[in-house]
């Protein structure tokens, strides 16, 4: 056992005295020590129930012959951090979570791990740690929130953000907004649509790192407690069989996850996190991989914000495995990949059933013949940009309009709510990238304001920042290279014509190469927005959005 390094032999007698202080018995010190990574806190609705999940995991581990030991991971609520300086501190926690989990696991010589995440950066951060540490590892999330109900219709947090925009447009009263405020988030859990947290929890299943239902069983269901017990048992089965994280997180598994991503219509943030997870196993994931997969993968689900269904509906329809069965039946998945069940993907999903063909469309009747995401390139984004095309209305799939340029999110929001943005405009928000932000803030407030003002079918938004999974419309993010390093987005001027062609994966600035060269010669880097603390170090180490905003030493950032 790895844990013998910390517990066995005369040399470790001092360590055993400390285990005695923890209450360990001699019998327990002879059993595998399983770290339970708990992201419980009392500030994130998706994490307030995780203490109960952790207790269930502990019972499962002990039942199967292991000794469970809990240690913490941090988690930020993106909804609470949204629209102010706090959003600079969201994406950056992903790497803190990965690094701190690595430190705890190796310092204390755990034999296996159960990760208990739920929200946006917590899930990919722990997936990165799992791949890096390569121990027997199982994931069990806290689960999604139930949808709210307003005036007889299901609603969620994205509805709340758009209600604020509608109030600014004069189409909602303060009482209307208050009703949304009190009803859209009725339970604990990760917000109820196919936003980033639920996207990543579903993709954890697709990767093979979570048991069936990990991404979809609602947080308040007792079924999730049973799932957590089974996760504890499963990690001991993996330990006994010698199955480790990198036996599961492989290149083929990551490509499976990307395929499922397209079918589900996941958050654009998956195009930051999958490259980062891939990096941990030495797989150079190019975001352009998304396009050929998207071209052959039908979009089968239109969960909020793309449509009127929610995670509870996907769960009732058969969940992620039912979606995977649809894809496997037409040869789009590698079904030989290993999973935490000790079985292959094919063995797991062979009896999965699609119980609701409106929530999960059959492959012969998809919402669209192409997947939910697209990577756009052109002279405005030479290294790529990302759009959730499953949430773009038909009339905005091809668009041309004048640039309305803003150097920060706040200025753009003021212009949108002030009525200064009109039909046909292309809002450009720059210097919000990984380095420029720093921290690559989500632009949910601007996109929600555009939708709430009634401009969602006529105005596009382009940024070197990123978007919440709750954003919809022609929202094109992760523009790379970013403005802070002199990318073409830094050279856009007010009124320049921008051409968007999502079907052909093009994003072009209608300005000649000669003019762009003249502008580039005059361009000067901006002074850093943050000069102290973690964000200063992060800005120095972070790479571009097209590389997953992974951290690298300065000499390796363009590798």
Swiss-Prot record:
Keyword terms of this UniProt record: 2Fe-2S, Amino-acid biosynthesis, Branched-chain amino acid biosynthesis, Iron, Iron-sulfur, Lyase, Magnesium, Metal-binding
Pathway listed: Amino-acid biosynthesis; L-isoleucine biosynthesis; L-isoleucine from 2-oxobutanoate: step 3/4; Amino-acid biosynthesis; L-valine biosynthesis; L-valine from pyruvate: step 3/4
Molecular function GO terms recorded: 2 iron, 2 sulfur cluster binding; dihydroxy-acid dehydratase activity; magnesium ion binding
UniProt xrefs under InterPro entries: Dihydro-acid_dehy_C, DihydroxyA_deHydtase, DiOHA_6PGluconate_deHydtase_CS, ILV_EDD_C, ILV_EDD_N, IlvD/EDD_N
Binding-site list for Mg(2+): 78, 120-121, 442
One cellular component term from this protein's GO annotations in UniProt: cytosol
Any single GO BP term: L-valine biosynthetic process
Enzyme Commission numbers on file: 4.2.1.9
Stretch forming the signal peptide: none
Co-factor: note: Binds 1 [2Fe-2S] cluster per subunit. This cluster acts as a Lewis acid cofactor.
PANTHER family listed in its UniProt record: D-XYLONATE DEHYDRATASE (PTHR43661), D-XYLONATE DEHYDRATASE YAGF-RELATED (PTHR43661:SF3)
Subunit structure: Homodimer.
The name this protein goes by in its record: Dihydroxy-acid dehydratase
Organism listed in the record: Agathobacter rectalis (strain ATCC 33656 / DSM 3377 / JCM 17463 / KCTC 5835 / VPI 0990) (Eubacterium rectale)
């Amino acid at each position: 056992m790895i844990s013998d390094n910390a517990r066995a032999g005369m040399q470790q007698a001092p360590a055993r005295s400390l285990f005695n202080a923890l209450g360990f018995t001699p019998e327990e010190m002879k059993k595998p020590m399983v770290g339970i990574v708990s992201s419980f806190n009392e500030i994130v609705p998706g994490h307030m129930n995780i203490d109960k999940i952790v207790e269930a995991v502990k019972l499962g581990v002990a039942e199967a012959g292991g000794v469970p030991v809990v240690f913490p991971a941090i988690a930020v609520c993106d909804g609470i951090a949204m629209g102010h300086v706090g959003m600079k501190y969201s994406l950056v926690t992903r790497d803190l979570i990965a690094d701190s989990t690595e430190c705890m696991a190796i310092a204390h010589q755990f034999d296996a791990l159960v990760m208990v995440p739920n929200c946006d950066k917590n899930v990919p951060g722990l997936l990165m740690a799992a791949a890096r540490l390569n121990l027997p590892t199982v994931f069990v999330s806290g689960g999604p929130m139930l949808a709210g109900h307003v005036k007889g219709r299901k609603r969620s947090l994205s509805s709340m953000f758009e209600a604020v925009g509608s109030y600014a447009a004069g189409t909602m009263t303060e009482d209307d907004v208050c009703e949304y405020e009190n009803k859209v988030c009725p339970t604990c859990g990760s917000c109820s649509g196919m936003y980033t947290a639920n996207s990543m929890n579903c993709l954890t299943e697709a990767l093979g790192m979570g048991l069936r239902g990990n991404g979809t069983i609602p947080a308040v269901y007792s079924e999730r407690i049973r799932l957590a017990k089974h996760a504890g048992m499963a990690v001991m089965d993996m330990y006994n069989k010698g199955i480790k994280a990198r036996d599961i997180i492989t290149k083929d598994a990551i490509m499976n996850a990307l395929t499922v991503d397209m079918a589900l219509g996941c958050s654009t943030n998956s195009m930051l996190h999958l490259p980062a997870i891939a990096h941990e196993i030495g797989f150079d994931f190019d975001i352009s991989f998304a396009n050929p997969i998207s071209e052959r993968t039908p979009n089968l689900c239109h969960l909020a914000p793309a449509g009127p269904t929610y995670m509870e509906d996907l769960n009732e329809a058969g969940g992620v495995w039912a979606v995977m069965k649809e894809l496997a039946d037409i040869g789009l998945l590698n079904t030989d990949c290993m999973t935490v069940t000790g079985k292959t993907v094919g063995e797991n999903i062979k009896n999965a059933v699609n119980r609701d063909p409106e929530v999960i469309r059959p492959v012969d009747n998809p919402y669209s013949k192409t997947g939910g995401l697209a990577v756009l390139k052109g002279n405005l984004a030479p290294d790529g940009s990302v759009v959730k095309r499953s949430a773009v209305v038909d009339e905005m799939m091809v668009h041309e309009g004048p640039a309305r340029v803003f150097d920060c999110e706040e200025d753009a929001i003021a212009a949108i709510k002030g009525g200064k943005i009109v039909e046909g405009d292309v809002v450009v928000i720059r210097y919000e990238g990984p380095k420029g932000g720093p921290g690559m803030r989500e632009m949910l407030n601007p996109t929600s304001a555009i939708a709430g003002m009634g401009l969602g079918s006529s105005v596009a938004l382009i940024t070197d920042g990123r978007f919440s999974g709750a954003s919809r419309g022609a929202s094109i993010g992760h523009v790379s290279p970013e403005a802070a390093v002199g990318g073409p987005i830094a050279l856009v001027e007010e009124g320049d014509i921008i051409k968007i062609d999502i079907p052909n994966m093009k994003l072009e600035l209608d300005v000649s190469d000669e003019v762009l060269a003249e502008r580039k010669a005059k361009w000067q880097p901006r002074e850093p927005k943050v000069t102290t603390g973690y964000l200063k170090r992060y800005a120095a180490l972070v790479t571009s959005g097209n590389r997953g905003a992974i951290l690298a030493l300065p000499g390796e950032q363009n590798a």
